[in-house]
Amino acid sequence: MAKRTFSTLEAFLIFLLVIMTVITVALLTLLFVTSGTIENHKDSGNHWFSTTLGSTTTQPPPITQTPNFPSFRNFSGYYIGVGRADCTGQVSDINLMGYGKNGQNARGLLTRLFSRAFILADPDGSNRMAFVSVELCMISQRLRLEVLKRLESKYGSLYRRDNVILSAIHTHSGPAGFFQYTLYILASEGFSNRTFQYIVSGIMKSIDIAHTNLKPGKIFINKGNVANVQINRSPSSYLLNPQSERARYSSNTDKEMLVLKLVDLNGEDLGLISWFAIHPVSMNNSNHFVNSDNMGYAAYLFEQEKNKGYLPGQGPFVAGFASSNLGDVSPNILGPHCVNTGESCDNDKSTCPNGGPSMCMASGPGQDMFESTHIIGRIIYQKAKELYASASQEVTGPVLAAHQWVNMTDVSVQLNATHTVKTCKPALGYSFAAGTIDGVSGLNITQGTTEGDPFWDTLRDQLLGKPSEEIVECQKPKPILLHSGELTIPHPWQPDIVDVQIVTVGSLAIAAIPGELTTMSGRRFREAIKKEFALYGMKDMTVVIAGLSNVYTHYITTYEEYQAQRYEAASTIYGPHTLSAYIQLFRDLAKAIATDTVANMSSGPEPPFFKNLIASLIPNIADRAPIGKHFGDVLQPAKPEYRVGEVVEVIFVGANPKNSAENQTHQTFLTVEKYEDSVADWQIMYNDASWETRFYWHKGILGLSNATIYWHIPDTAYPGIYRIRYFGHNRKQELLKPAVILAFEGISSPFEVVTT
């Protein structure tokens, strides 16, 4: 056998892995006592649990309040409430969640992230549901449990685990750090209570606003296909599905968008909920700006259209663009190619003749990732706008819900009269480490790897222990890189207990799945639920998949796709029969709703809530201004004059933006203001939620930093005199005293914008 050699990157990563493991084990030994660190969040009764060790935010025990509900009366329609709130969290000193790329930390803000809540209730108030679309990569179990606890403390039994869905849009440009399972905490470089609290507060605020705004209204539904925004990023895996099944569909991606139009009884617009299958990865893994990617841009455009005269994130109309079965769907429609040669990649392995898998990348339709995001997002928005305008089929019928917690590591699946199979403890395969054509890993591991590597296997066994024969056999043909389901220090590395949930609104069934279904998985999943409803009398149901809901469990491929072990299959953590298990579980929910036997269903084993988590590995240090300068001072002024289409760039003496996430009243890092002669004052025209602005933080040494604000002047900008303001918070630390966070601001010199 030839001697094994490693690239410089691989050798460095091996060294880094060993060092990190030694440090982690030492820290865990010192910091954690695993006994007595698990709490269960119940959905009835009052209780209070410590959020985390070293929490930066403390709260008093909740006091159950009697909410002021609308005075319900009979009418044809539903009570409808919509709400939106900021849930951005940290925009610095934290990993961006999604690509898993080392060093892809947040360094600023392209646009704020929002939680959008939609409450739909029967006219008599007997039943209701809350669907919350959150601009995050995924929903963590910890987020959901905390939100449910706070909802119970404020609203009693009105909003519960069965009628509240939290669904993430899956942007790969949002902050990490809000998880409780060890694998995700390590990927986040620790737990950020600052970000966790910010997100929870944003979700809660959006629900509070929707609850307060409940009013009589009507719901209309529409569907249509979206063209020129998707490709299947694992087409060779898709082809492994039966030809007879593939022949039923015209494409290897789901092109259908489903739209709900929400209006009051006078026909005035209230909001929109849209579900569509696409990965928000138009912003690639070189990005360091927090943003909501293509689906967030679609929501931004729709809300700006409906909320004329309001700044982004403000105004009464709320547009939620939610995720669906996006597992193998990419927006990078120019497809994969070898970036060093321009050649086509190998289709099965996504690798290149020269440079290997790290050179095989897909690209979007724009000149850069920003333009690609705009192009894809605008097409999605335009289709949603068209479907919204023409929606005429009214949704009628009761609001119903069913939910269970399930141990996904031990589900017996009856395939047919003679064959029963089981799910597995979680494990990730080798191809998980390869990444995808949307974001390659840099390691010399290819997609479609069906055999392990002796070196990596030995290194894993020495550091983490050897996978059991049981998990190896159960996960076949997956070669196990990480047997996460057998790792429990300091806490389990991936979840065992997950949520399965269906909420129906009339003839619409929303199936909240805790993961990423591939295209064909989603088709089988929807079809099975629809048939189950029909079997028990609820015919002609429309089933929509709400992806990445309630807890994250990676991917869900078909059994056939699993055999190829590309990225999505290697990331199907509960083994080859994961999809069959979910179909069986959701059929049970559909049957219970259709037969009015939900009350007879077991709630299932409650998920844990871990109290003591690994704190952020990035320390808090005091901010400093250069000698002779103050925070907010201008270092690089604006030019006296700009034309429409040019970019204004102003640099200020800055401070770490994560300080602002601790301030509950902080609303923006910047404003672009125009002087109005008619009122002799400055008027805000843009803020940091505007896609025309960018806020970038340059981290220096010893607490020094700069903040650069960019304004890309749009064609719609009015000529006149403008200025840019910067709002920040600096951390001040005096000897033997607790740190304090102080607000400051900076103002640029005025400049003129001209049209010619």
Curated annotation (Swiss-Prot):
List the catalytic residues. Answer: 330 (nucleophile)
Its required cofactor(s), as named, are:
Zn(2+)
Q: How is its activity regulated?
A: Inhibited by D-erythro-MAPP.
- Membrane-crossing ranges are 12-32
Cystine bridges: 338-352, 345-360, 424-474
Catalysed reactions, as listed in the record:
an N-acylsphing-4-enine + H2O = sphing-4-enine + a fatty acid; N-hexadecanoylsphing-4-enine + H2O = sphing-4-enine + hexadecanoate; N-dodecanoylsphing-4-enine + H2O = dodecanoate + sphing-4-enine; N-octadecanoylsphing-4-enine + H2O = sphing-4-enine + octadecanoate
Q: Which residues lie on this side of the membrane: Cytoplasmic?
A: 1-11
Organs and tissues of expression:
Widely expressed. Strongly expressed in small intestine and to a lower extent in liver and kidney. Highly expressed in duodenum, jejunum and ileum along the brush border of the small intestine (at protein level).
**Which BP terms from GO are recorded?**
apoptotic process; ceramide biosynthetic process; ceramide catabolic process; ceramide metabolic process; lipid digestion; negative regulation of apoptotic signaling pathway; regulation of mitotic cell cycle; sphingosine biosynthetic process
Q: Where is this region: Required for correct folding and localization?
A: 746-756
Q: What does the UniProt cofactor note say?
A: Binds 1 zinc ion per subunit.
In what pathway does it function? Answer: Lipid metabolism; sphingolipid metabolism
| EC nos | 3.5.1.-, 3.5.1.23
Which residues are involved in binding Ca(2+)?
110, 688, 690, 693
Q: How does it assemble?
A: May interact with CAV1.
Family to which this protein belongs: Belongs to the neutral ceramidase family.
Return the protein name: Neutral ceramidase
Biological source species: Mus musculus
Q: What is the lineage of its organism?
A: Eukaryota, Metazoa, Chordata, Craniata, Vertebrata
